């Protein structure tokens, strides 16, 4: 499965199949959340939140790829990510793109 954020894959003719997406909502353990609150007071990277967002992007991408595979896709083009806070310490990540088949 080829994943790109462009509307083409070099050297391939594409047949559009469908839009595909994946999403997840992730949160951190309350103990880690409290540690991150203190971290905002002194500055620096919020590693627990950074790790949470990286994990969320990976899960959402996996779900999008699984949806594309069910369609028989060879790739996904025009991939875009979006995220939003749904509550304190929890975030939703959604990824979407266009599933394509090589002609």
Each predicted region: which residue ranges?
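Short, well-ordered alpha-helical segments
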Residues: 20, 25, 33-80
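Membrane-proximal amphipathic alpha-helices
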Residues: 86, 91-92
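N-terminal presequence-like segments and the immediate start of the first folded domain
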Residues: 1-32, 70-74, 93-103
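Short, solvent-exposed loop/turn elements at beta->coil junctions and helix N-caps
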Residues: 6-9, 81-86
């Amino acid at each position: 499965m080829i994943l790109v954020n462009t509307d083409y894959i070099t050297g391939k003719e594409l047949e559009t199949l469908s839009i595909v997406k994946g999403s997840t909502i992730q949160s951190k353990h309350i103990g880690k959340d409290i540690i991150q609150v203190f971290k905002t007071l002194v500055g620096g990277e919020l590693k627990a939140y950074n790790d949470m967002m990286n994990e969320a992007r990976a899960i959402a991408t996996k779900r999008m790829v699984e949806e594309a595979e069910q369609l028989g896709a060879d790739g996904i083009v025009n991939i875009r990510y979006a995220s939003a806070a749904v509550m304190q310490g929890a975030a939703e990540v959604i990824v979407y793109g266009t599933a394509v088949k090589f002609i």
